[in-house]
Curated annotation (Swiss-Prot):
This is Rho GTPase-activating protein 6. GTPase activator for the Rho-type GTPases by converting them to an inactive GDP-bound state. Could regulate the interactions of signaling molecules with the actin cytoskeleton. Promotes continuous elongation of cytoplasmic processes during cell motility and simultaneous retraction of the cell body changing the cell morphology. The keyword Lyase does not apply. One of its GO terms (cellular component) is cytoplasm. The lineage of its organism: Eukaryota, Metazoa, Chordata, Craniata, Vertebrata. It comes from the Eukaryota. InterPro entries: RHOGAP6/36 (IPR037863). It comes from Takifugu rubripes. It is found in: Cytoplasm. One of its GO terms (molecular function) is GTPase activator activity.
Amino acid sequence: GDFTWNSLSGRSVRLAPVDIQSLSELERARLQEVAFTRLHQDYDLGCQITMPK
């Protein structure tokens, strides 16, 4: 799919698929936070989810 965002000022950002192993530690941590938040907001799993330490 096309993962491109365009701003009103004409700037654009395009996301490309990458292997998760190639992400930096900071990128992995942020991805984990986003996934955790989405699980809580979008799904009623009926169980407690905790972030690994």
